[in-house]
């Protein structure tokens, strides 16, 4: 990934960190079998046989396509490229997603207004992998109404309990709040004698 400067991740923690629970990550790792099981449990299927997934909405009395827009900041070619690949892959599975690539200022405006269905973002976490900014009321990363007192409590417990993150990561994955893609690695290159 990214020319060797990133590692794929299932949990919101650097995979080489002692905080990364490989067993839990395996439970939530990529699996088409689990994907189709989740669709079935949510009653999502191609009901009108048009190649697109639909969700029956009882209050409406009919099915609606599973569609939406993924927002990405256009200032990074790599981010746009990654978001494009994600949208293409999800559409190949039957979703009806479009990608909206906008400049940084508009990206922030749309995030703050909650005017998106999905967004591809890049976040630099603190060394202790604190996720509080995503879940605390008024948090700097609480976009799309992610404020959740239970998640905030689990974040606090993880910080107090020396990185015991199992319950936090399990709830995060069960709820689908965040989907980690990768963690960047940084390197400093020097020449001998410098």
Can you say where each PLM-predicted feature lies in the sequence?
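Sec/Tat-exported extracytoplasmic proteins
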Residues: 1-5, 17, 39-46, 90, ...
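Extracytoplasmic/peripheral linker and loop segments enriched in polar/acidic and small residues
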Residues: 1, 7, 19-20, 98-107, ...
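Extracytoplasmic/secreted proteins, especially bacterial periplasmic and envelope-associated proteins
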Residues: 30, 34-37, 78-92, 106, ...
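Append "and occasionally in soluble cytosolic enzymes with long acidic Gly/Pro-rich linkers
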Residues: 1-88, 167
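Periplasmic binding protein-like
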Residues: 70, 91-137
């Amino acid at each position: 990934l990214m020319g060797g400067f990133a590692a794929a991740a299932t949990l919101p923690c650097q995979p080489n960190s002692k905080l990364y629970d490989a067993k839990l990550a395996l439970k939530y790792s990529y699996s088409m079998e689990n994907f189709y099981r989740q669709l079935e449990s949510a009653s999502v299927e191609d009901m009108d046989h048009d190649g697109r997934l639909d969700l029956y909405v009882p209050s409406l009395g009919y099915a609606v396509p599973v569609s939406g827009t993924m927002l990405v900041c256009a200032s990074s070619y790599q981010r746009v490229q990654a978001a494009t690949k994600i949208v293409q892959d999800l559409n190949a599975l039957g979703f009806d997603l479009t990608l909206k690539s906008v400049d940084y200022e508009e990206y922030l405006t749309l995030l703050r207004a909650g005017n998106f269905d999905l967004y591809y973002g890049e976040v630099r976490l603190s060394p202790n992998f604190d996720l509080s900014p995503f879940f605390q009321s008024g948090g700097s990363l609480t976009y799309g109404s992610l404020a959740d007192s239970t998640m905030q409590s689990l974040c606090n417990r993880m910080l107090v309990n020396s990185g015991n993150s199992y319950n936090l990561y399990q709830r995060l994955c069960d709820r689908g709040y965040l989907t980690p893609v990768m963690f960047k690695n940084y390197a400093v290159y020097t020449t001998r004698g410098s």
